[in-house]
Amino acid sequence: MKAVILLSGGQDSTTCLYWAKQNFKEVYAIGFDYNQSHKIELEQAAKIAKEAGVEYKIFNVQGLLAKSSLVEHGDHNQPSHLDKSLPASFTAGRNLLFLTIAGSYCADIGASDIVTGVCQTDYSGYPDCRRTTIDALQNALSLGLGIGGIRIHTPLMYLTKAETWRLAKDFGCLEIIIRDTMTDYNGDETMHEWGMGNESNPATKLRVKGFYEAKEKGWI
């Protein structure tokens, strides 16, 4: 069986890469260049994919997504201009576009399974990270691609960040998560015991919080 994994180079998608390697015979990783402020994540993703022994392909989707602090390199701690209840990092349509491209790529290589690291437990309120959204898109892709049923797997959907750290330990990729993954929205490469980043942005704060919770529980 073949699976396509959306690999950004961050903690969650890298953990899902190793989940996919345990659950599928062939794994193909894809990433997206959307002019993100932390574009170094793509370099890290390529390194991670090579170490994992999987093929990695980057799609250029610059100019196809709505404005956000990630695209415009703005203040990630402010609310979104689209909805004040969402953070500025919310990029409308991002996961929908990425998963649709992944579906098309599945058709090209003869795969039926997509793996993504979206999560609605410790997430930032992104509406495209909810399981209801994923289910709706899974149905649309299954109907529209003409290749039979598409399955979108979300191994982290109901896990806290601390539980995601534990999963990395279980999969034997904890060292890789700490050493190689880039979660920081600003692409800060300062190294700490929990990995690279700076606690000036929400993504890194969540990563750090989960790390110390997992450590306190004896999971890592």
Feature-to-residue mapping (PLM):
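Glycine-rich phosphate/adenylate-binding loop
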Residues: 172-189
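ATP-dependent adenylation/nucleotidyltransferase module used to activate substrates
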Residues: 1-174, 204
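Functionally engaged cysteine thiol sites
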Residues: 16, 184, 198
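Iron-sulfur (Fe-S) cluster-binding segments and ferredoxin-like electron-carrier domains
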Residues: 188-220
